[in-house]
Amino acid sequence: MDNIKLTIAYDGSNYHGYQLQENAVTVQEKLEKALNTVYYPYKITPYSASRTDSGVHAKGQVANFFAPKQIPIHKIPLALNTNLPNDIAIINAEVVGSNFRARRDAIKKEYRYYVYHAPYMDPFWRNYALHYREQNLDYTKLQQAANDFIGKHDFSPFRAIQGSNPSIDPVKEIYEFDIDVNAGEDGNLIIFKVIGNAFLYKMVRILVGTLLQIGNGKLEINAVKKALQTGDRLFVGPTASPQGLVLQQIWYP
């Protein structure tokens, strides 16, 4: 049996997240169906690095699975893509060591969040960015406050309470948090790029929601510092909508 690592991209618009759910269509369901078609009669179960939420996208999701050596590794992407819907694609497949686990062995992840900042919404971005109409957005404050997230902190106030696992350690480390403004062909995109060792449930979307409220003056410039110091959610903004979020990349040793 080979342990095979997949890199997966998907448009999450039509899915209730990555992880299997009863009575809901998920990315994992489609992936398992394709795997079990390709490797029939074997039952194949993929193990993913990240469980993205409903409506969230990925360019660099990673999963691993164990399968018999019946398909050459270079043919696996085409074999799976032939059996996947056109909003899910296998980008790469490689054989890894038998001890590799996509979730456990990840050392850092990059998420990107896209905001379309204009009075109107470009129809081509409606499923891939948050539409932000308010014009009084201070870009300097956005980056200044984003810098306060960098480092190792207890991010408890920046995770969704409902649906989260309280046993997960809330101490995470953010390595980089960069914001590109006036991006895109028309200059209306704001791209939040955050890299960390791991993230709590809906954490990235809450970080972005907080920064937007700092940028428009609804929260003070030191709100991030106060939230991290006190754990008080009074200094935290709303959860940004899911369609702007992309799991960009995952690193391994």
Swiss-Prot record:
Keywords, sorted A to Z: Isomerase, tRNA processing
Residues given in the record as substrate binding sites: Y111
Residue positions of the active site: D53
GO molecular function, one term: tRNA pseudouridine(38-40) synthase activity
Entry's Gene Ontology BP terms: tRNA pseudouridine synthesis
InterPro entries attached to this UniProt entry: PsdUridine_synth_cat_dom_sf (IPR020103), PsdUridine_synth_TruA (IPR001406), PsdUridine_synth_TruA_a/b_dom (IPR020097), PsdUridine_synth_TruA_C (IPR020095), TruA/RsuA/RluB/E/F_N (IPR020094)
Gene: truA
Subunit structure: Homodimer.
Full protein name: tRNA pseudouridine synthase A
Superkingdom field: Bacteria
Segment forming the signal sequence: none
Function statement: Formation of pseudouridine at positions 38, 39 and 40 in the anticodon stem and loop of transfer RNAs.
